[in-house]
């Protein structure tokens, strides 16, 4: 009788071992669920965004160009504010081309703004040429020229940056000044530096192709 009881208990223990799942299987399932619930961080490399100035790279600007799609005249712009002052957007003026992006309303010190523009839509022979204007908290205005032509047999890429006294909006007069008279820089795949006056300086780089990136850093002199 005792042997029969022991045998029954032994069989019951074997059955329980087979029926219950192993601890390792449960923990594996839990790890899979927890990983799937981790949110994917979205990229901040979008035109119209304000990012940390230290994170402004050619790679970010290349991503912005890619988002614009298959357009043969386009530009991605990034300008890093290390001036010690906050910038406030005035407007964007286009001599040719267009943009769907609104200039960031303000750019604090140590931040950079991202922007893009493109040729006019449709089968039209135009480039993308314009000026961006930001006023500084000291009452002066930063004008930024970008020029990507349609016909490279006649024209080249050009860019410029100038600090104007007082609050100004970008317009045809500012474009003419920056393009023709204020010593613009050629987009030649090289860095160019110059003094902006008012205790500031700039350093910028522009590529020479029709799918262009323009990166500028404004800092204290």
UniProtKB/Swiss-Prot annotation:
- Report if keyword Cell membrane is assigned: no
**Protein keywords:** Cleavage on pair of basic residues, Cytolysis, Ion transport, Membrane, Nematocyst, Secreted, Signal, Target cell membrane, Target membrane, Toxin, Transmembrane, Transport
- Sites binding phosphocholine sit at 96, 129, 147, 149, 175, 179-180
Which positions are cleaved off as the propeptide during maturation? Answer: 20-42
Residues the record annotates as the site (Interacts with the lipid membrane) are 202
First-listed, main subcellular location of the protein, grouped into a coarse class: secreted
Kindly list the residues the record flags as site (Important in the initial contact with the lipid membrane): 155
Motif Cell attachment site, crucial for protein stability located where? 186-188
Q: Which Pfam families is this protein grouped with?
A: Anemone_cytotox
Q: Where is this region: Plays an important role in the hemolytic activity?
A: 45-54
Q: Where is this region: Trp-rich region, which is important for the binding to lipid membrane?
A: 147-162
Q: What is known of its domains?
A: Composed of a long N-terminal alpha-helix and a core region rich in beta-sheet structures. Before the pore formation, the alpha-helix binds the lipid membrane, partitions into the lipid-water interface and stabilizes the monomeric molecule on the membrane. Finally, it traverses the bilayer, thus forming the transmembrane pore.
Q: Function of this protein? A: Pore-forming protein that forms cations-selective hydrophilic pores of around 1 nm and causes cytolysis. Pore formation is a multi-step process that involves specific recognition of membrane sphingomyelin (but neither cholesterol nor phosphatidylcholine) using aromatic rich region and adjacent phosphocholine (POC) binding site, firm binding to the membrane (mainly driven by hydrophobic interactions) accompanied by the transfer of the N-terminal region to the lipid-water interface and finally pore formation after oligomerization of monomers.
What's the family? Belongs to the actinoporin family. Sea anemone subfamily.
- Quaternary state and interactors: Octamer or nonamer in membranes. Monomer in the soluble state.
Kindly provide the name given to this protein in its UniProt entry. Answer: DELTA-actitoxin-Ucs1a
Which species does this protein come from?
Urticina crassicornis
């Amino acid at each position: 009788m005792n042997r029969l009881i022991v045998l029954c208990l032994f069989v019951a223990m074997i059955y329980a071992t087979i029926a219950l799942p192993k601890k390792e299987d449960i923990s594996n399932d839990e790890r899979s669920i927890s990983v799937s619930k981790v949110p994917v961080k979205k990229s901040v490399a979008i035109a119209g965004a304000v990012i940390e100035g230290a994170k402004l790279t050619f790679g970010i600007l290349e991503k912005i160009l890619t988002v614009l799609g298959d357009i043969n005249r386009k530009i991605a712009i990034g300008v890093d504010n290390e001036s010690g002052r906050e910038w406030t957007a005035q407007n964007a003026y286009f001599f040719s081309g267009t943009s769907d992006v609104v200039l960031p309303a303000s750019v604090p010190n140590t931040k950079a703004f991202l922007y893009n523009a493109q040729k006019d839509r449709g089968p039209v022979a135009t480039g993308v040429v314009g000026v961006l204007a930001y006023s500084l908290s000291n009452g002066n205005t930063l004008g930024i020229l970008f020029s990507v032509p349609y016909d490279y047999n006649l024209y080249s890429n050009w860019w410029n940056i100038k600090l104007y006294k007082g609050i100004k909006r970008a317009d045809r007069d500012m474009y003419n000044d920056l393009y023709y008279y204020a010593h613009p820089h050629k987009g030649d795949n090289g860095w160019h530096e110059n003094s902006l006056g008012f205790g500031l300086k700039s350093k910028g780089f522009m590529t020479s192709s029709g799918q262009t990136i323009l990166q500028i850093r404004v800092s204290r002199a």
